[in-house]
Amino acid sequence: MSKKLALFGGTPVRNEEFYDGPHIGPHDLDRLKSVLDSGNFGGIPFPNTHHTAFADLFTGKLGAPYGLMVSNGTISLSIALRALGVRAGDEVITTGYTWMGTAAAIVHINAVPVLVDIDPTTWCIDPAAVEAAITPRTKVIVPVHLGNQIADLDALRAIADKHGLAILEDTAHGHFAEWRGQCVGTHGDAGSFSFESSKIMTAGEGGFLVARDEDVYQRMMSLANCGRKEPGYDGFAGRTLGWNARASELQAAFMIGQVEQHDALHAKRAASAAKLTAGLAEIGGFTPVGNDDPRITRRQYYEVIYRFDPAAWEGLHRDEVLSAILAEGIELEGDAFYPPVHKSELFAVDAVHWPMIAERYGDRIGPDSVDLPVADRAAADESVWVHHALLTGDDKDLGDILEAVAKVRDNLRELHDAS
């Protein structure tokens, strides 16, 4: 291996990309062919074979009483909020440190997203900030289980019960993670999951909704199916303006295999994450976000998040170090992964198009609209995200990651002098 940094003309540690596509199971092609042979591609309304089978399989593994697959994990949030009774002008509290789709789902139903700061230890929504933000217009709290973390569901449940609010868990990262032995997504009044192409379980696109209450579930079903009723249920037909958020039989058939493979892949990621954390601890400067909270009885590893310590890198900024590691063929992500919502270029929300935000935010929701110092610092200076694709390969993949980081650390003076 060249000891000279690739950033300055040396040979990179790795030239091949990590595989980040879906993992194909032994029965996936047979299931997809069965859909093609059937000529029946639609997913809902029931009874459609693979959608029903997948919904039963997924909700059964989650321990949820009701659930349905939808077209993606953003519209699922909008549907859930409507099903929970959120109306135009209502306020929904969520974290400022998440993919902007969490907040966009609130805006798209003409409700007002109230962005609050994150807990400095877990980087999930701060319960104290949630309670401080509650007003008479607040209807729902939307925590996000970020990366391999879980929001403090005990504290959030106590706050919600105290103030008569609902909880919608954004579980796009947390498939089958567990809090006190119960899957996340099932602790709140509703839960939303994503099967987008980067997720640990994917059909290219797709989402899933779970509910604790049958009426909420029936509202979800109607809202996802153009306002129609489920056969045999007429509680909402004719009174609900819905979306076409239906997932197809092809997506549902493929997702059955994703559930079947999950536990084996999860075990691989968990072992790799432990080895990576131990290896980075020896190198120094990367500390895992979070703590050993005993209430987290199973983590998920969509992303493992580390906190960068500039003191361990002679004052270099995180982005300088990550750029050098990237040149070695290893992509560890910083603020490009998740800028705070109010600083995301994709979160284009102004009062001309969305007048309900004007009273709280003025002309637009932008960089100066809210003060979220912990989220801002995490995104701009501290966060290092390791995608699950880097954790699902073989020992060589893991070795390449650690070798690249160590190589940059060994050439720290050269990097520092060039900064």
Curated annotation (Swiss-Prot):
Its cofactor is pyridoxal 5'-phosphate. The modification N6-(pyridoxal phosphate)lysine is found at K199. The keyword Cytoplasm does not apply. One of its GO terms (biological process) is polysaccharide biosynthetic process. CDD domains: AHBA_syn (cd00616). Pathway: Metabolic intermediate biosynthesis; 2-deoxystreptamine biosynthesis; 2-deoxystreptamine from D-glucose 6-phosphate: step 4/4; Antibiotic biosynthesis; kanamycin biosynthesis. It is an enzyme of class 2 (transferase). Pfam families: DegT_DnrJ_EryC1. This is Putative L-glutamine:3-amino-2,3-dideoxy-scyllo-inosose aminotransferase. It comes from Streptomyces kanamyceticus. The gene is kanD.
